Amino acid sequence: METGLRTGELIGLTWDSVNFEKRTITINKTLEYRHKQGCWRAGPPKTPSSYRTIPLTNRAYEILQSVYATKDTRKQSPALNQVLEFMDRRTGEKSSLIMKDLVFINWRTGEPAKNSSYDTHLYKLCDEATIKRFCMHALRHTYATRAIEKGMQPKVLQKLLGHNSLQTTMDRYVHVTDDSLRKGVQQFERNNQDQNGVKLVSGQ
């Protein structure tokens, strides 16, 4: 909700990609757990446009500072001893992900939280709140929709989400909510009241 990251981008975030001074994070790799193979797989972001640097909100900055302050006391499993190689999508050169440098791990197991674990936790929260279940990717859609509702420029949102095209951002990720419909009508009504009369507009 604070960054609009894809789940794999969040899981694969490492400390060398966090700049506390500039208050940014850089997205240049992903990480996912392959259940059939029983192993972790590092990879590049989805497209060349997915390589990006994102300014942090105050809330995101505070969370990262809190995690960083306790990173040396967290449990570490043997899985964190791995260094995973992958191909950089932009250069075609080999790159690597050092597992022990991951920002987010499971404090109980000392391993990176699997993709499915995030969804499972969300499902539990939804059940407790007695609302319809949704997955992690739905939060990315929510981020996009709320950003536009709060006045963010579409091209800026496209850059933050790492999309190739603005059409993808606006048609697939930004949704018209009941609240935005209501506000749109209220804005129309206010603007209409500011006018002395109504000028008819034909289709000619």
What are the roles of these predicted feature ranges?
Residues 22, 35, 39-51, 58-60, ...:
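C-terminal secondary-structure termini that scaffold catalytic or DNA-interacting sites
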Residues 31, 142, 161-187:
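Catalytic-site neighborhood detector that most strongly recognizes the C-terminal catalytic loop/helix
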Residues 1-31, 155:
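Short, charged phosphate-coordinating catalytic segments
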Residues 3, 54, 71-93, 99-159, ...:
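Short, basic (Lys/Arg/His-rich) helix/loop patches that form interaction surfaces
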Residues 3, 7, 47, 142-145, ...:
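Ser/Thr-centric signal marking residues that sit
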Residues 28, 57, 105-107, 174:
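Residue-level detector of conserved, well-ordered beta-strand and adjacent loop positions
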Residues 12, 20, 171, 175, ...:
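Phosphate-coordinating loops and pocket residues in cytosolic domains that bind phosphorylated ligands
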